[in-house]
Design a protein with these regions (language model features):
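Conserved helicase NTPase motor core
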Residues: 10-22, 26-31, 41, 61, ...
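P-loop NTPase Walker
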Residues: 1-108, 112, 214, 268, ...
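Short amphipathic alpha-helical segments
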Residues: 74-76, 99, 123, 236-237, ...
Length: 274
């Protein structure tokens, strides 16, 4: 790997950015909005930690919220002379782990095929609803299913959980529970999983298999999470399982810009971060 000059990484930063880049150990929270140069800070901080010997490049994981952001981060790090750093979404990293561990957990069977979108399947099920409810937008139903799965709420537990959260389903609750359950069963019959299942199954596996968890933790030990205000409870739990009792975690976000709240994300994780 090419030598990276740590001084060069600090040369064009303002004082606040430099302080963030130099904070390479322990839990770090960076509150930064759009236009603040946060992507540059994340990439420089990562490069600085590697250049100063804090962590090897192959033990770093930068978590982004979109594939586009992950690709941009990889390109930025490559331009800094660091081609070996992993930058992925929660779902992409979970997928890589499931592909590795799934066969051992399921009698050698490969990981089921991933649905590109849950909307077509939900749409077909929605058309079987009575009366005008069959015209309910599939996106509204999908969002509510995502909210539930972000909290590992099964269909039969939905009514109680939604009431406790003060949440109203897009259709009468009995019909929503029917759609939710039918959707889960339809996926199982088709031998498919969705993007929510990637996280649910990874969390379930890591909670139940200490050996798998130890393997995962041995591979990555230094974490940065961008757009942390958009993490949901399931992603937060997965992050905790990846991290274990270590504290080399940097979260970056802006609690005024949470854009995924309707599917269960909350800026509370950022606001409570220690």
């Amino acid at each position: 790997m090419p030598h990276v000059d740590s001084a060069t990484l600090l040369a064009d930063l303002d004082p606040e950015q430099e302080a963030a880049v130099r904070a390479t150990s322990g839990p770090v929270a960076i509150h930064a909005g759009a236009g603040s140069g946060k992507t540059r800070v994340i990439s420089r901080r990562t490069a600085y930690a590697i250049a100063t010997g804090v962590v090897p490049a192959d033990q770093v994981l930068v978590v982004t919220f979109t594939e586009k952001a992950a690709k941009e981060m990889v390109e930025r790090l490559r331009s800094l002379g660091l081609p070996g750093v992993t930058a992925r979404t929660f779902h992409a990293h979970a997928l890589s782990q499931l592909r590795h561990f799934w066969p051992a957990w399921h009698g050698g069977a490969p990981l089921p095929e991933l649905l590109d979108s849950k909307l077509p399947m939900i749409g077909r099920l929605a058309r079987q609803l009575p009366g005008h409810y069959r015209f309910t937008p599939s996106k509204d139903l999908a969002d509510e299913i995502e909210w539930a799965k972000a909290r590992r709420i099964a269909p039969h537990d939905y009514e109680r959980a939604a009431e406790a959260a003060g949440r109203e389903a897009p259709i009468p609750v009995d019909l929503f529970i029917r759609i939710f359950g039918d959707y889960e069963r339809a996926k199982a019959r088709a031998g498919r999983i969705d993007f929510d299942d990637l996280l649910v199954e990874t969390v379930t596996l890591l909670e139940a298999d200490p050996d798998a968890t130890a393997t995962v933790r041995a591979r990555k030990r230094w974490f940065s999470v961008d757009e942390y205000q958009d993490t949901n409870p399931l992603q937060q739990r997965l992050l905790e399982l990846w991290l274990g009792d270590r504290d080399d975690l940097c979260v970056v976000g802006d609690d005024y810009q949470s854009i995924y709240g309707f599917t269960g994300a909350t800026p509370a994780h950022l606001l409570r971060f220690r």
